[in-house]
Structure formats: structure tokens, C-alpha cells
């Protein structure tokens, strides 16, 4: 079985409250994009309970057993009699970018195992397992535009489509750790109801649909502001950092030659 975990972007991100459990409440829109990893899952018949994990592409800086893909298998293997699997991940979605690549891989692993072994898990059950792996993992089970709140695990489907826009995504070479990004945040009430995002023309998003992490992260990674300015110069009608960074996306009415503008950075463009 070969599946293709996709990335997401955040459209707007308000950090609204520090919780008593040490986490933060936030409000954001998760939007899936077609930047994808490649995940191959092969059943090892005659053997039980083992996940053999290998990877190519962007190096994964953690032991195989601590990778979220392996953890996804382990969660299901404790409750179901699973054959061992050989799993290969070709990593394309950058880390430290705010794109949810690791969470996507984990969620797609759950969905893939459910199909491979005919476990019969429904969407709600899969989202429950995904929530044990990370706050944004359940989104990748749904994988359509949502308004997310709480820690990001609570979601409401919204009506939003960017299919009429060309998207350019740029990842500076320096990444950002989520804990570091949160350290510079002062929680505040959301200044816009992101559930209404689909009613606001994209041309009016600037200054209204903002990412609170930018004020925390850009002083540490000034390249982010440089990328934003270049995207604007190329004609972007809306530019934002996604998640806690460091990737930045711009929405355009037209195709642009973004690779020439960012020869040293990771660049992805929508079709």
C-alpha cells in the first residue's frame, strides 16, 4: 500500500489563553495542501506486532521507534492483533515549518493500517487514536478545511476554497521549535472570528487574518520577514507564516517564478 500524506497551512492563528495544564488554547483554520510525503506500508505475513521503519528524503532526526509513524502502529497494535509491517517513508514535507508533516504521516499511517487490516474503524475512532499522537493529528483524518480551537484538536468544518488562487510556499533554512515559539507569545482574545473566513474576500485578509506567532518568531528568524516581503513584491495578495513557522505562503492571482526568487530555500507551488 502506498499513500501520500499531505501538509496543511494555518490561515490565521490566534493564541487566546494559557491553560492550567501548561498548553495554550488557540483559534485557527487548518487548510490541506498538495505538498505530500510518500508512505509505503507492506504487511509482513507470519509475524506479529513489529513495525520496521526506514526513510529517505529529508533526514529524520529521531530513533525509528520514536517516530510518529511507528507510534501510530504501536497504538493500534496494543488493541488489535496486527501483523508486522515494513514501512518506508520518503520525506518531502520540511520539519520545523508549521506544515504538520509529522502529524500527517502519523494520521495517514492510522488510516492506512485501518484499510490494510480491515479494522473497521470509523472516522471518529480514528480521530480518537490520532489525538493521542498530537493535537493536530486528528485534522489529517478529516483532511478538509476546518476551524480549529482548544489545543487544535477541536474542529468545525468550514466552507472555504482557495482553488482559484496560486499558492507559493517558502521554507527558510532555519526552522523553529514550537516550545521556543510559544515562549514569546502573550495570549490575547481573537480579533476576528475565523469561522467567518470564507465570507471575507482574500484581498481583505491582510491585517485582519493574522498569525500571532509572527511577533514571537520573526525576531529570532528575520529571514521570514524577508520572504514575506519578496512574495509581496512578486504580487501576492496575501502573505502569512503558517503555524509556529518557519514556512511562509503567499496567495496569487497568477503563476510566478518563485524558485528564481528563493534559490537557497525550499519552495513549493500549487498546480
Show where each model-derived region lies.
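Conserved, helical-rich catalytic subdomain that frames metal- and/or nucleotide-binding sites
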Residues: 51, 142-238, 253-263, 269-271
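ATP-binding N-lobe of GHMP and related small-molecule kinases
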Residues: 1-97, 115, 119-124, 159-163, ...
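N-terminal pre-core extensions flanking Radical SAM catalytic domains
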Residues: 245-254
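DPxDG-like acidic metal-binding loop motif
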Residues: 97-123, 128, 139
